[in-house]
UniProtKB/Swiss-Prot annotation:
Cofactor binding summary note: Binds 1 Mn(2+) ion per subunit.
EC number(s) per entry: 1.15.1.1
Protein known as: Superoxide dismutase [Mn]
The encoding gene: sodA
Names of the cofactor(s): Mn(2+)
PANTHER family on file: SUPEROXIDE DISMUTASE 2 (PTHR11404), SUPEROXIDE DISMUTASE [MN], MITOCHONDRIAL (PTHR11404:SF6)
Matches recorded under Gene3D superfamilies: Fe,Mn superoxide dismutase (SOD) domain (1.10.287.990), Iron/manganese superoxide dismutase, C-terminal domain (3.55.40.20)
Family statement: Belongs to the iron/manganese superoxide dismutase family.
Species the sequence originates in: Mycobacterium scrofulaceum
Residues that hold Mn(2+) according to the record: H2, H50, D134, H138
Amino acid sequence: LHHSKHHATYVKGVNDAVAKLQEARANDDHAAIFLNEKNLAFHLGGHVNHSIWWKNLSPDGGDKPTGELAAAIDDAFGSFDKFRAQFSAAANGLQGSGWAVLGYDTLGSRLLTFQLYDQQANVPLGIIPLLQVDMWEHAFYLQYKNVKADYVKAFWNVVNWAE
């Protein structure tokens, strides 16, 4: 359902917005240009965020990362458990819809956690998202109802650290 309906809707939204944007530009319809640029950003953000998220999940996932990523997490957060607590707090503390993210800051050469709001892919400049969890209600409501904390706790059992 999540992949075949929600993610597919974002892809369709990208295609529709691109077509409408081309038409609006050809007609010099500035209001439609701005509207469709906004719609394109939203749907493209939804597509990009979900594409990263699918790679972050595996039925064989869980446990902890190893190697360079494990060392970077320990360096940035003090331990994997402290990182997991901070990332989970970002996810559970998100007001409304969005994503919790572990990103690599290419400017500061460090890992950090942050929240993304909605789907606008408003990732700070220089940040490469490494791990994301979808905190839109459609991601957890069917199975976890309104108990976001249970969803976030279960997320750690399917994190694909190999990717």
